[in-house]
Amino acid sequence: MRIIQILNTFSYGDAIGNHALTIHRELIKRNIDSKIYARVIDARVREYADLYENYIEQKDDTILYHLSSGNDLNKEILKHRCKIGLNYHNITPGEFFEEYCPDIQKNCNLGREDLKRFKDKVDFVIGVSDFNIQEIKELDFNCKLYTIPILINFNDYNQTSDSEVLKNLSDGKENILFVGRIAPNKCQEKLISDFYFYKKIYNPNSRLILVGNPDGIENYYLRLKRYVSKLKLQDVIFTGHLKFAEILSYYKKASLFVCESAHEGFCVPLVEAMYFNVPIIARDCGAIKETLGDGGIILKNYSPIETASVMNKLMNDEKVQNLMKENQNKRIEKFKTKYIMEQYLEALGCNGN
């Protein structure tokens, strides 16, 4: 038996790439034959994967196909005759990008149409959240369905952080953080509005740090910059691309993590913030609540001024912060590799190893 993971793009440092690599390493540890194939492979992870064109199917293979976008591979994968499982990471609805990037909108819409092709043609589906599996159920998939969180290698977070960033963030200002692609579904404009009222009413000695890249959605990024200028708002930082050591520094120096996303299939940064015991406030949407659990405060339909008030109360309530940290530590245990990998082994039919 071989476990064959297939992705369209095997990237370095992104959540799905890290997830696939962790599965691969854990399978190898258990002496299970494991391979990763992709159409596009980042040079930094080239040693772990081969091009999809080089894959030669064997009858006892089990393919785990990672679906997160629209691409030609979504059709090609169904030509294989071995056992096929779908790892569904969710696809952002295209309407979020209509105003900013028609190409991304088209890709997202294509991906959601492609998802329907897998109905009755795969042996099982793994969704990284109940939210994702609910989408699969609504399409009437007739196969085994599993909700298993994404695998996160927490050892990576023990690496040395960037000393220069740590120094720059240690100037006495309160650091309000969000980590995620600069994209309309992440709703960074809401974060800017929240921060505007928080800084104006409660704490002028604070900054908002938006970690992430526009990555093809520059029109949205420029809109955010114009909005900041219109508000005459100081201390809003767009970091752009960062090294991993720099990202670690931002988490370590964060006073508060705020998430206003309107669509999330899992949201790895919430888990990262919990790992670093950063107090969290998040909007209730998609898989946010099930990922966060009791590790933060969930808000529903709060205005920016109301959110700013909650931010202030949390920042000034040490008792609530301490309880939140205890809950975060308990919650993180649910995402540990050993626990999650046991579930993947069962779904893949390797639970005897």
Task: Describe each region flagged by the PLM.
Residues A262:
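Aromatic "clamp/platform" in nucleotide-sugar-dependent glycosyltransferases that forms part
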Residues R39-D42, R207-L222:
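Glycosyltransferase donor-sugar binding loop
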Residues Y221-A245:
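Nucleotide-activated donor-binding/catalytic signature segment of Leloir-type glycosyltransferases, i.e.
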Residues K119-T160:
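Donor nucleotide-sugar binding/catalytic pocket of nucleotide-sugar-dependent glycosyltransferases
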Residues S249-A254:
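Short alpha-helical donor nucleotide-sugar binding micro-motif in glycosyltransferases
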Residues I297-I305, K313-E318:
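Conserved acidic donor-binding segment of nucleotide-sugar-dependent glycosyltransferases
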Residues L270, P279-A282:
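Short hydrophobic beta-strand element within catalytic cores of glycosyltransferases
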Residues I126, K167-K186, I192-F195, I209:
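Conserved donor-binding/catalytic core segment of Leloir-type glycosyltransferases
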